[in-house]
């Protein structure tokens, strides 16, 4: 825990949350180690973990600790000047690199989108114009987000045992590199921040509610982290480091949260009957809106490809922006490239990570699974054994 807190003090982007004893933070801040000292200590601890003779019940915990420590050392190397090619950096942090993308399939998806939003001119412009019809007005966004969060929670607690006192608080912010962020405070409490510099369509608002809240980040963190009434959790569960294999699992599960909470028909029905009226928008196009957003979501793998080429020096800033607009239909492409400047290979977590987890869920649940099967597989594939049990 001390190493993770120390790294977070030196590099706030590395630490998603810490919900452990405050005295650890005080001790680190009283005598903060250098990045080099953190890297050396992580290496020494990794060697100790590897040398331990453990029973099978502890072996998986040791493997996870070793992977996180290796990723921590790689992060220290990056912060102290080491630069690796995108794929090697991604493997060092997350254990995986994005697979080559299927350009033919992506072209088919863009063609399907064009059939809905119209032909002629740049597709990103036509998609942006189409999406504007479903964009939540700024003054109505808080009500839409709260209703979406409430429904995502209602569906989640029907399948997942959450502690009675857990809750999320909604906060509107500006001038952030991301569109939304969930900050876990500990003991089942999170703050979901929504960046109002971005615009959200109705379906995107629902995706954010599930992703950041239920059954996404807040739910996962609540179930995994120790609480005052459940101190038996391993202490490392009090920490979420972003640039680790655990960080990839967390982001991948959040990316699929809306698909677990809602079938396609349920999703269309809820946005049409509940969110469109709250947004003050005509719900006649709800089906087409959800269909197009699903297709645009399938283009996200382009983001990893562009990030790889950009960070490896094959694309300059302006060309990276253009490729994100033309190939992935990203409306805030400049903001995304600035995000890549700051978070680099974290793009892997919500692109390749999503693909990997989606394949595991499909293998577990099979085609067209019933709700209870879908939820059971989601918990089994995204949470360590026992994390879903509330004492």
Whereabouts are the PLM-identified features?
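N-terminal maturation segment of proteins
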Residues: 1-391
């Amino acid at each position: 825990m001390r190493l993770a807190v120390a790294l977070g003090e030196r590099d706030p982007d590395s630490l998603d949350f810490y919900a452990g004893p405050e005295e650890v933070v005080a001790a680190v801040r009283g005598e903060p180690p250098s990045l080099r000292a953190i890297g050396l200590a992580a290496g020494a601890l990794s060697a100790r973990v590897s040398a331990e003779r453990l029973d099978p019940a502890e072996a998986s915990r040791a493997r996870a600790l070793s992977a996180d420590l290796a990723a921590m050392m790689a992060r220290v190397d990056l912060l102290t000047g080491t630069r690796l090619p995108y794929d090697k950096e991604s493997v060092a942090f997350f254990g995986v690199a994005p697979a080559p993308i299927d350009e033919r399939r992506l072209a088919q998806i863009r063609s399907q989108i064009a059939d809905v939003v119209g032909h002629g001119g740049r597709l990103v412009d036509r998609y942006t114009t189409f999406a504007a019809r479903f964009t939540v007005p700024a003054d109505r966004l808080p009500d839409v987000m709260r209703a979406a969060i409430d429904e995502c929670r209602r569906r989640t607690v029907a399948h997942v045992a959450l502690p009675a006192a857990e809750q999320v608080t909604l906060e509107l912010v500006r001038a952030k590199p991301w569109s939304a962020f969930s900050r876990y405070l500990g003991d089942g409490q999170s703050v979901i921040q929504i960046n109002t510099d971005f615009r959200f369509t109705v379906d995107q608002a629902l995706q954010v509610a599930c992703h950041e809240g239920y059954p996404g980040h807040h739910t996962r963190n609540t179930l995994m982290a120790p609480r005052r009434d459940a101190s038996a959790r391993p202490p490392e569960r009090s920490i979420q480091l972003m640039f680790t294999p655990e960080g990839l699992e967390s982001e991948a599960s959040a990316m699929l949260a809306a698909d677990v909470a809602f079938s396609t028909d349920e999703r269309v029905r809820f946005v049409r009957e509940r969110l469109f009226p709250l947004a003050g928008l005509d719900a006649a196009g709800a089906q087409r809106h959800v269909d197009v957003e699903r297709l645009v979501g399938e283009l996200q793998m382009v983001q990893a490809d562009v990030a790889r080429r950009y960070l490896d020096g094959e694309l300059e800033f302006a060309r990276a922006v253009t490729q994100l607009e033309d190939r992935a239909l990203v409306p805030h492409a400049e903001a995304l490239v600035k995000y890549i400047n700051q978070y680099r290979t974290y793009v892997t977590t919500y692109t390749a990570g999503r693909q990997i987890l989606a394949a595991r869920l499909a293998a577990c649940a099979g085609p067209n699974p019933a709700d209870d099967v879908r939820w059971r597989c989601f918990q089994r594939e995204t949470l360590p054994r026992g994390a879903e049990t509330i004492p």
